[in-house]
Amino acid sequence: MIKAQSLDGLFEKLLDGKSIFKNKEVLRPSYTPDLLLHRNEQINSLATILVSALRGETPSNVLIYGKTGTGKTAVTRYVGKELERVSEDKSLFCSVVYINCEVIDTQYRLLANLARHFEEEVPMTGWPTDQVFMKFKEAIDARDQVIIIILDEIDKLIKKGDDVLYNLSRINTDLRKAKVSMIGVSNDLKFTEFLDPRVKSSLGEEELIFPPYDAEQISDILKQRAKMAYNDGVLGEMVIPLCAAFAAQEHGDARRALDLLRVSGEIAERENQPQVLEEHVRRAQEKIEIDRVVEVVRTLPTQSKLVLYSIILLRSRGREGKNVTTGEMYNVYRQLCHHIDVDILTQRRVTDLMSELDMLGIVNAVVVSKGRYGRTKEISLSVPVENTRKVLLEDYRLKPLVDFKTAVFNKMFS
């Protein structure tokens, strides 16, 4: 008989060990340091636009673009925080409201959050949207003030329509005392193509582009945070250069670099290692990449999942080392659709979905010539097969495909 382990003192034992971290939170994306390195130009540009709020005027609306981890959110929050501090010192009323549109992704939720920020009692569901908008306008127009609304990941919001942006962009015509300005932050340079031309014109009065960091700049950022995050002597000599090099390969993503530095330390600490070494960084890189792939695959549409599963089946059924052609992939895809009773898309549309997987870094597709047989695309996987397969089969619509590889598939390729 197995004796159950006592849980007495479980956390006390873990807390007894000395942590290699001084303050892990400074390595998280939510932390904004007092000094933002290598972003003076962007800070000054945004401050120049927003300074009119301190004169009681309406600042221009701003669109901020740049790839992930280029400091867009950090700069916007940093400048917003400073604006509020100066306005308070000068006894002015200036509010900066930050909204993450990946979380608050509907018109109703956005307006309800704005109204609640100004202490209006609005339920998170149930009211007509017009009523919520009216409550928000009444709340802010009670006094002379300037309000800056930061819409981070604004492209996530417009996927469900741009009505709310249209209404917010025209709100100043309905206000007597308050003035409202918007800052939209996005990783996607093309998202405005889907906007109503009137919204696009109003929202993009000013535009700021954030370039990627280079390896040296990322290294500076990591050194700054490492001093605050880790105890002295904990980091091995190659840890920061390696984190910076990995992140520079990922289009200069400082967020990725900070994640690497944090996860490397977590791996070392869980193994009771006194130092964070190069091997911990390499393992952290692998873990983060798997986590990224899992998240991307999990959120794919069903048809894209079927395309990906077709490629996985072909790669794992005696075709290791051989690339998959679009024709082979489409044949298997059709069988999968039949098997779970899903509509079959045209080969052209399926090829488009495969190209989207290529853009996401999940597969690698290369056009090759077959001589007189024409050209085709050869597809290889850029992600771990088993991890990806498990994530795909978590989808209840794909669960019936668990046994497909030993039934229909064997018949097709026997």
UniProtKB/Swiss-Prot annotation:
GO biological process: DNA replication
Positions that bind ATP: T70, G71, K72, T73, A74, Y213, R225
Origin: domain of life: Archaea
Keywords: ATP-binding, DNA replication, Nucleotide-binding
MF terms in GO: ATP binding; ATP hydrolysis activity
Keyword Ribosomal protein among record annotations: no
Family designation: Belongs to the CDC6/cdc18 family.
Role description: Involved in regulation of DNA replication.
NCBIfam families found in the cross-reference section: orc1/cdc6 family replication initiation protein (TIGR02928), PRK00411.1-3 (NF001625)
Protein name: ORC1-type DNA replication protein 1
